[in-house]
Amino acid sequence: MKKIGTQSIETKCLLLRPFLESDAQAMYDNWASRPDNLLHVTWDAHESPEVTKQSIARWVENYQNMDFYKWAICLKENPDSVIGDISVVDMDVAVNACEVGYILSKDYWGQGLMTEALKAVLIYLLQDARFNRVTARFVTANPASGRVMAKAGMGYEGTFRQAVFHKGQVKDFSVYGILTSDLEKG
């Protein structure tokens, strides 16, 4: 693993960049305050823009740490307005692996944008940051997230039945993964 931190990434339609404190209102409006947008993530809606500001302030501070990876997802045509985020949510240095998590404003679902962002981050983590393995997981009640992972080139690795307490219920979750060697195979 090579600790390179969160650097900006451009794709066909997106700019993935570090969060700025000025992103708080857009994040709050676009997804952090919307319960309908948060059905399948581990955290609850932010009660106020202040909660969002505090989260972003922590992230901005963490950008000093070169093993902190968290990108604001923006449309290239509007790089000052965040529509989602994607980040490394867990790391296992012993096996040179990490897990990614992501969220996208519901207003942008079904357009291929999350797949585009995930593909770019997988390349960054496997080639540039030199992780050997990247995984992602989702509650099986959200099969669209599994399709995003598959379209981004990740392979299905298994389902853990009744393995996570999520939003007041015990649920199943599935895991997808990719190795550096998978990326090299194309």
Give the location of each predicted region.
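Hydrophobic residues in alpha-helical segments
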Residues: 31, 41, 63-64
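Short, conserved alpha-helical segments within structured domains
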Residues: 44-48, 69, 141
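A short hydrophobic/aromatic micro-motif that marks alpha-helical segments and, especially, helix-coil
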Residues: 48-50, 63, 168, 183-184
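Conserved GNAT-fold acetyl-CoA-binding loop/helix
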Residues: 37-58
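Short, surface-exposed helix-loop/turn micro-motifs enriched in polar/charged residues
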Residues: 43-44, 65, 96
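Acyl-donor (CoA/ACP) binding surface of acyl/acetyltransferases
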Residues: 1-26, 30-36, 74-186
